[in-house]
Amino acid sequence: TDENGDMQLAVSDMEIYSYLTPEYIASKLDVINNASLCVIDTNLPAETIQYLCENCTVPIFADPVSTAKAVKLLPVLGKIHTIKPNMLEAALLTGIPVTDERSARKAVDILLELGVRQVFLSMGAAGVLYGNARGKKRIPNYPAEIRNTTSAGDSFMAALVMAYLSEFSTEK
């Protein structure tokens, strides 16, 4: 990590994702569809994401992970219940530059028009822009001493899942 707590380099063996094929997921579909929701990220193969979005009957929460991998969500955005992009990923998914709150609001509108039910667009130090069919709201970050940002996005997704399962309102 650097002096700001941001990861500078990571080494990961991503081969395990290649085993999560549509065929394998099909063998587990009953389990998935009996869950309360399904969380995916774009480390999954594109064909597996497509299969899940076509066959999963529970809400799908998606983490775009990176701009390089977020493209896998383009064909299935209308099947995603909740998405958690950052500004770069939102720009890729919507086709517009996302550089400030105004453009972030437009990106949220586009994602909602494409069929996504809830958008939590991370704007770094500016907080998160939340949007759904009822409107949009910027949620500021709580002041905190940041020591390390590794897995911050994963923790945020876990909190979104917990809030959804607990039927918390966005304001809560």
Q: Where are the model-predicted features located?
A:
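Conserved functional loop/turn residues at catalytic and ligand-binding sites
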Residues: 2, 43, 115
